[in-house]
Amino acid sequence: MKSLLKLALAASVLALLLAFSATTSVAQEHPAYLHALTDLRHARAHLERPDHGELREQEKKAIHEIDEAINEIKKASIDDGKDLNDHPPVDAKMDWPGRLHRAIELINKAHNDIAREEDNHFAQGLQQKAMEHIDKAHHHVEEAIEVVQSRM
């Protein structure tokens, strides 16, 4: 009975090590995707109202598209294990138009990060879907900027 328990424990440890090394390997092969995840979470944080006020339709759509892009990247087994709230801090003194412009910059960085040539055919499809969501998010943030500028 003890030898069976030892064997099960050894098999569990081996499975854990294999899973960890596979995750590390994917991350090493696609560091740009990890940068894109960070940029997308950071852009998302800039789109959240600092006073927790109501988001306009364009901002809601942009956040939705960012979430979808993050999900597509994670479907490609490129997951850094971080949640949406794990991002660099947002400057609390930045006004709303500044936050929107910063979100555009971060979305552009994420787009550039994942736009690199992909040799994995499976990942190419997910890459394309993620880029479509990123481009839609960019469009919605531009719309939000136009709304803000029209009210100034």
Name what the model sees in each region.
Residues 8-21:
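Bacterial N-terminal signal peptides
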